[in-house]
Amino acid sequence: AKYMFREVLGIDFAEPFRRIPWIEAMERYGSDKPDLRFGMEFHDVTDRVKGHGFGVFDDAEYVCGFAAAGCAAYTRKQIDALTEFVKRPQVGAKGLIWIRVEADAVKSSVDKFYTPDEVRAVAEACGAAAGDMVFLLSGPKFKSLTQLCALRLEVAQQLGLRDPKTFAPLWVVDFPMFEWDDQTQRFYAMHHPFTSPKLED
């Protein structure tokens, strides 16, 4: 891979490519091929948000979110557009929860169910600071992570963070051998089972 970068693009990577276990890639970025050119890592806030009477979170297996730096200035129109984005069939989320973090206040779409201190604690758990916006999705764990990944990439695109001339190569390792498909109700090999076998499989 380094040879191809060097010969085709004239880019020489001196350091070894980063390696990330599959489960870490999924939990931090929602993808088995994560874009590492920018941050916006995911955070599990399930335990922080359950038990407050908000059924969407109380009934969910998993609640996760990320902080988008500088996005507290997003207008209602921009937030609504992102909500419609995640509700598209291609993404499949039922809605989007947001937290606007300012120096002296926090505002969220679920203020009815949480105190300002509770909302701020969730925002801080997602790594947010003043001037940031936090976006949260909930549902089955890996479905929510995948949906949040689509949102992460969309927000990064809007912020100009996905520079096609910048590269952040990595190897994702330790893939599960099989994955379950809800539609066909059966297991499928996640990748060709003989390309990178593990002894425990």
Range-by-range predicted roles:
Residues 1-201:
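Class II aminoacyl-tRNA synthetase catalytic cores and aaRS-like
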